[in-house]
Amino acid sequence: MQFFNFLLFYPVFMSIYWIVGSIYFYFTREIRYSLNKKPDINVDELEGITFLLACYNESETIEDTLSNVLALKYEKKEIIIINDGSSDNTAELIYKIKENNDFIFVDLQENRGKANALNQGIKQASYDYVMCLDADTIVDQDAPYYMIENFKHDPKLGAVTGNPRIRNKSSILGKIQTIEYASLIGCIKRSQTLAGAVNTISGVFTLFKKSAVVDVGYWDTDMITEDIAVSWKLHLRGYRIKYEPLAMCWMLVPETLGGLWKQRVRWAQGGHEVLLRDFFSTMKTKRFPLYILMFEQIISILWVYIVLLYLGYLFITANFLDYTFMTYSFSIFLLSSFTMTFINVIQFTVALFIDSRYEKKNMAGLIFVSWYPTVYWIINAAVVLVAFPKALKRKKGGYATWSSPDRGNTQR
């Protein structure tokens, strides 16, 4: 029975934690600021931002993204594009745009991964702050102002991660991910910000203090997710990371099951690589929020394997002809299903209410409230089974390269 309690109440406890954290964050920090007014900033005192765009085979999206960044009204900006040895015509497109626009183009001839590309770019950055964007990102006009404002009040702030929104919503899979980002992922980042440590910045859209990135030794070229890896390096050096929901961008997500699976396995593998690398270093720190983040990841992995072992044990020892046993098992199943569904409805309703401030039409996603978070846990469990062994086999000292998943339809 203790095993069952753990299997059921771990996801329930985490959902409640995210709900409470999101509500508190919203009423104490988020609701006080207007979406229609950017922070009051004196242009003469405005900090400059270098925008870094690393791209590999992004010919379908790089023109839109680069045009967007060039059109941003942020008064002090520098743009550096790094082509990471693309095998398509990405470089040709960038050279063509450069004929009529002012930006720095670093054209690497060999594909050595996003981390290496960012490292090459930041070394040429003139300003003290660098904005890292993916090649499919469309940045909201006011986002840089909201993000840079955070650094005024916290000298130990190393990075501010923004609020990514989904551009492609034409398919069912696109719509589901829209709701996922609006509810589950938004809840998690709000709660973690309150707890004092965000597990990871969003690689698609984050503003870094350049000196902090240099201090931690830049991005790791041998880690499959450079964003998670640099987040923990910042944590361990005493820097803080904040989530800024008012700073929005628009990105593309996979619209095929294969593309989504590939993306989630990479994310999970990257998290596990960081866990294996940084566990002992984390235990030596005196930052309690980092202990919470680390043990949350460990418990998530253990939860998956305990579920499998427990289900296997039940299957082997079950007497399917025993009416009492079957009745009891079915009752437990109904209880757990009702509990999870009830919590899911509350979590989705709260999250989408908060998120409706940014996209009111996302409230239509309430149709998914009863089942998607449960599916989310099941998908994550399957991903862990594949990703954790990959993390154990990580080759240190090389270059971690990967291709972007399918980007779907670009319609907003």
Swiss-Prot record:
Record key words, sorted: Cell membrane, Glycosyltransferase, Membrane, Transferase, Transmembrane, Transmembrane helix
Enzyme Commission number(s) from the entry: 2.4.1.-
Membrane topology note: Multi-pass membrane protein
Subcellular location per the Swiss-Prot or TrEMBL entry: Cell membrane
Record field: transmembrane: 6-26, 298-318, 332-352, 366-386
GO function term, MF aspect, one: acetylglucosaminyltransferase activity
Location, primary (coarse class): membrane
InterPro entries listed in its UniProt record: Glyco_trans_2-like, Nucleotide-diphossugar_trans, PGA_PgaC/IcaA
Gene3D superfamilies associated with the record: Spore Coat Polysaccharide Biosynthesis Protein SpsA, Chain A
Phenotypic effect of disruption: Deletion of the icaADBCR genes leads to the inability to form biofilms, produce PIA or mediate N-acetylglucosaminyltransferase activity in vitro.
GO CC terms: plasma membrane
Any matching Pfam family: Glycos_transf_2
GO terms under biological process: cell adhesion involved in biofilm formation
Similarity-based family: Belongs to the glycosyltransferase 2 family.
Functional note: N-acetylglucosaminyltransferase that catalyzes the polymerization of single monomer units of UDP-N-acetylglucosamine to produce the linear homomer poly-beta-1,6-N-acetyl-D-glucosamine (PNAG, also referred to as PIA), a biofilm adhesin polysaccharide. Requires IcaD for full activity.
Name under which the protein is recorded: Poly-beta-1,6-N-acetyl-D-glucosamine synthase
